[in-house]
Regions:
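NTP-dependent small-molecule kinase module
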Residues: 2, 25, 110, 142-190
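Short glycine-rich anion-binding loops that position phosphate/pyrophosphate groups of nucleotides
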Residues: 80-82, 104-106, 161
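Hydrophobic anchor at the beta1->P-loop junction of P-loop NTPases
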Residues: 7
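Conserved lysine of the Walker
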Residues: 15
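P-loop (Walker A) phosphate-binding loop of NTP-binding proteins
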Residues: 10
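ATP-dependent small-molecule kinase phosphotransfer cores
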Residues: 32-93, 114-118
Length: 190
């Protein structure tokens, strides 16, 4: 049995994409906390924020994280604010390692400016100038980045192509004793 690989980072860091690539490469199930919440509730993330506020959404997120922490051998893509709660971090560390995908704010703006902010309520949804998006990301990053670094087992530069980031995560995991199974070691070494 191996530990879950839990990806954290700012919105636009590539967590969902890298998680899918890792899942394919390692033969692991991928769980995206936002997708799980949408599946549980039948509602979009912006709808949940409007109906229940951020605190109500965070409680749903906590329940999803707690449930996912009962499994092993997952790749988990976490919402950007999931690790702000200590109880989520405690749950994740029971069966997983936390990998922080770090991306400069300017790269995040590039990734989000063409509609990528639409379903991200903490960015204020669509519209606004690139400068406004940059300022919102800087403000959000100012509070979140120190927390990501605090809780992560490793911080990785994720500003490059997603396939390279996934390979970097695998290289790190290979150097750990309890992240990959022996068969996963063999699989990625061939």
């Amino acid at each position: 049995m191996s530990r879950n690989i839990c990806l954290v980072g700012m919105m636009g860091a590539g967590k969902s994409t890298v998680a899918e690539l890792l899942g394919d490469r390692l033969g692991r199930r991928v769980a995206d906390t936002d997708d799980e919440i949408r599946g549980w509730t039948g509602r979009s993330i912006p709808e949940l924020f409007m109906e229940h506020g951020e605190e109500g959404f965070r409680e749903l997120e906590r329940q999803v994280v707690e449930e996912l922490a009962t499994f092993h051998d997952l790749v988990v893509s976490l919402g950007g604010g999931a690790v702000l709660r200590d109880d989520n971090v405690s749950s994740l560390l029971l069966t997983g390692v936390i990998v922080h995908l770090d991306v400069p704010v300017e790269v995040l703006v590039e990734r989000l400016r063409d509609g990528g902010a639409d379903d991200r309520p903490l960015l204020g949804g669509p519209g606004g100038t690139e400068e406004e998006l940059l300022e919102r990301l800087r403000s959000t990053g100012k509070t979140r980045d120190p927390r990501y670094r605090e809780v992560a087992d490793v911080t990785m530069d994720a500003s490059g192509p997603a396939d390279q980031v996934a390979e970097d995560v695998i290289a790190w995991a290979l150097a750990q004793t309890d992240v990959l199974t022996p068969s996963e070691h063999e699989q990625v070494m061939t």
